[in-house]
């Protein structure tokens, strides 16, 4: 049996707070036997045609014949029979083997490169827990990236995965060239290297690096410190000869193609020239057109300086693809991004804490606090956030991470970030599968510790609903998540067409996993980036009783749930909360 509360957005309380609804549930953590109750559905309306008394419909749970439920126009809802359900193969296996409480909540993003671009390598990553495959437009050709996208799509279709695709733009910042085709170059201490804007037709001289910015030689000064890839390698400018800049290596390291360059003078970052460059370059616009044509799920924009850039890009995507569900991710990796953080997050569909480049623009000791602040703002504004850059950097060359790296990953999980991202570790590292396994095992262990220790953080989640209907959805999800923790339920079910209510539940970070049922494949893949969500594709109707009965039947047949499991269900079609045991 089930107990439910239904709300209608037609209710109006002129400048009154939301009415406090008494909930007939205990607040202890013991499981609550709801079998003795019948389903209660309430609808109230202030429209002239309705009576002054609310309509109450009562029906037994599990019969599939709960009478007529009404939508906002007081018309009966047409019920359709879902014939199948799509779920990620790895999640299905985890649920069968380990149960609800052992499913991983933190999502994993893998950058695809030469080490992982083959179909078998991609499948190994998907089996290992990859939720999102990232393609970095700084490297490779569009034809190469197209082949990767095709393999990921084939993987989803043939093997039963739901891996989303994120395209990361290059951005307009100053960076190195492609190293003449070499995959990397080693800069040793004391070596003299030349950074030049020349275009070499013949093989370039030894220890010479191209720079993409024509004014580079004019802007740098002798004595400036040049940082490669956020400080992974450092040089001191010792001489300027026309378009060439001679530099001495002061901190040795590995040089990678198209690595970002920043230069410092008298202990401060030289920002003026970068500030004049556009956030989205002409190449980026061509890459964005490519991403739209290929139907990627996310586009990550580098070096975002303001919300205006995000809004412009969203309008551009909408004009080029009116039915597109592409989400825009803002990469927070500059001082300007931090200054305008809240407006950027509000405008975007999510954010990435790009710690490598961010650490080249602010003092290193400020990066941890900046990360925590970005994660917190994203959580408050209900936007997924990815912690990226150098999570397991040593595993590019070694099979085991450093203990400091494990602690760093643990902290990101403890901060309740939505996702963790591998960069070079999976793109060009020698142990991509092992690196992913480390992220997965650390995430599961820290999440389990958090639940065992009852760390229900007291983060204030501000109201974000822009309409009255959105505010009701928000209150429902907040209440459902709190009830789930208090009652110790096994899972939260959410039926959502656009994914909004699923994201609201994810924002609350409940103890139990969230089963998100949606009718659209693209929405399902997008939800795969958000904390705690297990996205399913399922055809459903507006009749919650029918949806639940058929969902129970389909999931029980696959061994993913069993009779007696306690579930709370919400829906963005009929704004409601239902609590029930699986029949």
Curated annotation (Swiss-Prot):
One of its GO terms (cellular component) is chloroplast. One of its GO terms (molecular function) is ATP binding. This is Pyruvate kinase isozyme A, chloroplastic. Pfam families: PK, PK_C. It catalyses: pyruvate + ATP = phosphoenolpyruvate + ADP + H(+). It comes from Ricinus communis. PROSITE patterns: PYRUVATE_KINASE (PS00110). K(+) binds at residues 136, 168-169. Residues 1-74 form a transit peptide. ATP binds at residues 136-139. Residues 43-75 are annotated as: Disordered. It comes from the Eukaryota. Its EC number is 2.7.1.40. Its cofactor is Mg(2+); K(+). It is found in: Plastid, Chloroplast. Oligomer of alpha and beta subunits. It is an enzyme of class 2 (transferase). Mg(2+) binds at residues 333, 357. Pathway: Carbohydrate degradation; glycolysis; pyruvate from D-glyceraldehyde 3-phosphate: step 5/5. The record marks 331 as: Transition state stabilizer. Belongs to the pyruvate kinase family. Keywords: ATP-binding, Chloroplast, Glycolysis, Kinase, Magnesium, Metal-binding, Nucleotide-binding, Plastid, Potassium, Pyruvate, Transferase, Transit peptide. Residues 43-52 have a biased composition (Low complexity). Residues 62-75 have a biased composition (Polar residues).
